[in-house]
């Protein structure tokens, strides 16, 4: 079986500095994410899960219908623990490179995974939740990865300045 190629992992592996996922019925969040992406320095990708009534009608309904969101959607907030469920009773545990769904109450709070949107490693893991080998876990929604990048023009100008200094020495 082939490994699933996702837009988020593709963006992570090609150097995008802002990576986010949301769904089409989440208008309030989409607007905020669009503004963040617009003002982000560097490449940005927002994956929007959206049904197509002709080719894949209802494909995301098991995830994004209100009655399923508590168990199927993991809302990401920088600096906050990854909790989900009707009463936030579940968490995601990263244990020796293995991702597990565990009862939050069974762990000391120090063991909870705190979302760090600057961690590229954790961003790779979060982008895979809800699919492939992690199909039984909730789908991560929100800013998955964010780090400022220099614009290519700035890098080019910095490089030219260094070259000019070396030539003029």
Features from the language model and the residues they span:
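Conserved thiamine diphosphate
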Residues: 1-37
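Proteins with a high burden of low-complexity, intrinsically disordered sequence enriched in S/T/G/P/A and R
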Residues: 3-6, 47, 161
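Flexible, low-complexity linker and terminal segments
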Residues: 54-169
